[in-house]
């Protein structure tokens, strides 16, 4: 096994997560340290402005390049703060656009700068190969969930509530299925920021003070996304019309309705089998209103991933460390049942230019298995 640092900056724009993991891309060994470097408010605002303009941006846009550099340096700071002797880095980058129908998924981040600043080979560009093979480019975390869940009772579902919510379904026979299921925290975060100046509904306080508007919720659930068969994926801004539907509501009622939207989207997902357990990861598991709504539907079958010893705050970062090792070995990152790709697909590109030979020997070790 090798020591890999995974780096993740999600669409919620709350910070850069860094996590160490020992892995060979097949098995998951010991977990290393973890750290989160919060987005400075100014960088969050600039990144959000890039998200809003991404559909019309060129790759040489000066502000885009400036934001990309500052985001990369924030990732460098996360690696240094971890202070762990990594041999490889998995760098997801910051998604600013995800349109699989085009097909296009755009993650910004300078892998070359990251490699030079840390002295460690960097694996990046995890989604392009899947898109080229007819896949959605997301979600990519299911194969990591499957590796972590080895030996657990099945069938099992792992729900990640990040900016977008996605689910990994592991069948009794080990079959792996997955898809994005609907909004996660992104809409609720945007609503809270607009009405309270705080970038999230902390502890679900705003939603708990409000009432769900049934008519608005029905309108939200009428989005064509929910009629599409899985596998399917979402851009963070996919439900942009939600803000127009919510406009007449009070801040509290809007938050309550958005929380109910996330829960209803999960509950309405057609399942090929009934999981014996639901495990929840991602920032949404910290929202009591979301968790209460999910538990009403799952009962005792639902729990946070901490119940089985996983670190719910580090899971996505750990995943990209795991995927980095798989990518170097040429192992599949996605499958027909997880992204809709026509075949199992590997992916990722390795950035090692300018590094000493000693720093890149890990690549040969991994490729030899």
Feature map (PLM): residue ranges:
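Glycine-rich phosphate-binding loops at beta-strand->alpha-helix junctions
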Residues: 96, 275-297
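Gly/Thr-rich phosphate-binding beta-strand-loop-beta motif of the actin/hexokinase/Hsp70
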Residues: 1-33, 155-171
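Short beta-strand-loop/turn "lid" adjacent to the catalytic site in phosphate-handling enzymes
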Residues: 54, 58-109
């Amino acid at each position: 096994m090798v020591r890999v640092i995974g780096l993740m900056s999600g669409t919620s724009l709350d910070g850069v997560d860094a996590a160490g993991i020992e892995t060979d891309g097949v098995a998951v060994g010991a977990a290393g340290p973890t750290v989160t470097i919060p987005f400075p408010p100014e960088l969050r605002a600039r990144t959000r402005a890039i998200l809003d303009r991404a559909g019309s941006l060129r790759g040489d846009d000066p502000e885009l390049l400036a934001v990309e550099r500052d985001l990369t340096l924030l990732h460098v700071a996360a690696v240094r703060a971890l202070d762990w002797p990594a041999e490889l880095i998995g760098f997801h980058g910051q998604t600013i656009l995800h349109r699989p129908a085009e097909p296009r998924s755009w993650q910004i981040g300078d892998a070359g700068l990251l490699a030079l600043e840390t002295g460690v080979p960097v694996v990046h560009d995890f989604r392009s190969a899947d898109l080229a093979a007819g896949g959605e480019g997301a979600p990519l975390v299911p194969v990591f969930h499957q590796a972590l869940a080895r030996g657990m009772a099945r069938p099992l579902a792992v729900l990640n509530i990040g900016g977008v919510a996605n689910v990994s379904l592991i069948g009794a026979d080990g079959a792996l299925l997955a898809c994005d299921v609907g909004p996660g925290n992104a809409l609720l975060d945007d609503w809270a920021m607009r009405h309270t100046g705080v970038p999230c509904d902390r502890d679900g306080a705003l939603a708990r003070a409000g009432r769900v508007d049934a008519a608005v919720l029905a309108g939200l659930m009428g989005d064509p996304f929910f009629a599409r068969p899985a596998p399917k994926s979402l851009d963070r801004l996919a439900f942009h019309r939600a803000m127009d539907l919510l406009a007449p509501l009070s801040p509290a009622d809007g938050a309550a309705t958005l929380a109910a939207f996330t829960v209803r989207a999960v509950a309405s997902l057609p399942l090929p089998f009934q999981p014996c357990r639901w495990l929840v990861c991602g920032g949404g598991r910290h929202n009591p209103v979301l968790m209460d709504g999910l538990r009403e539907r799952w009962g005792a079958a639902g729990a946070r991933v901490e119940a089985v010893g996983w670190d719910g705050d580090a899971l996505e970062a750990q995943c990209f460390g795991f995927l980095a090792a798989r990518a170097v070995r040429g192992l599949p990152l996605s499958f027909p049942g997880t992204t809709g790709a026509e075949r199992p697909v590997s992916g990722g590109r390795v950035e090692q230019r300018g590094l000493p030979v000693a720093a890149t020997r890990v690549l040969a070790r991994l490729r030899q298995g």
